[in-house]
């Protein structure tokens, strides 16, 4: 997501896995989940996995390491930054992608926990509900929008960012604060698939299929129309 948000077309990925003792039953359980997760999401995107490695050592019995590398191509003068442009006072924040639910809430802290199978239901809310086919559509539509922005010399007028580990809170703050701004976020306008959740969930839940633009008001409707169509 970070590579795509720079205005690049993602062309390949690779991965590096570190698991515990290969004879350990817990290691086998974690190994199966990781490999299934990477394949189950990566394959529908149509992005080739060009390599990787895997090592087993008892030091990783309690906490595995999953390192992913993504490759993309973009011309230097077409790079989109993950912060608001200069003179961005009054710019709009646009949230695109999957409607918000209760999945992916607390995902950052969950990523550092020791995994225990008996607690998987307890931790389920921290795990994102994947929709790789929606992600593929978002990638393709974003690539088309990049070309429009390039053609009209608007690349330097916008910022683009994935929602990170803190959802809307993370994206809005990082887009604005990096350039010395603050941001007003109206959570009532966030598109939702589940109602009556605590406001902190709408603010902080993370999913792979959500991104945020910052742009001047005169092109806001064009970006909205582009994705909605």
Model-found features: residue ranges?
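Glycine/proline-enriched, intrinsically flexible loops and inter-domain linkers
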Residues: 1-229
């Amino acid at each position: 997501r970070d590579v795509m948000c720079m205005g690049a077309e993602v062309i390949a990925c690779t991965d590096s896995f570190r698991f515990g003792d290969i004879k350990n039953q817990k290691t086998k359980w974690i190994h199966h989940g990781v490999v299934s997760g990477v394949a189950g999401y990566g394959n529908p995107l149509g992005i080739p996995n060009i390599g990787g490695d895997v090592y087993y050592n008892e030091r990783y019995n309690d906490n595995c390491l999953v390192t992913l590398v993504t490759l993309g191509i973009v011309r230097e003068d077409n790079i989109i930054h993950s912060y608001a442009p200069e003179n961005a006072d009054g710019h709009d924040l646009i949230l695109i992608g999957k409607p918000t639910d209760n999945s992916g809430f607390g995902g950052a802290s969950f990523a550092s926990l020791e995994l225990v199978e008996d607690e998987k239901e307890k931790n389920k809310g921290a795990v994102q509900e994947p929709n790789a086919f929606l992600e593929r559509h978002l990638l393709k539509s974003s690539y088309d929008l990049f070309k429009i922005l390039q053609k009209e010399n608007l690349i330097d007028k916008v910022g683009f960012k994935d929602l990170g580990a803190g959802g809307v809170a993370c994206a809005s703050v990082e887009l604005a604060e990096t350039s010395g701004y603050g941001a007003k976020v109206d959570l009532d306008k966030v598109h939702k698939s589940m109602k009556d959740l605590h406001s902190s969930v709408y603010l902080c839940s993370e999913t792979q299929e959500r991104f945020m633009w910052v742009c001047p008001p005169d092109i806001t409707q064009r970006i909205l129309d582009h994705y909605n169509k």
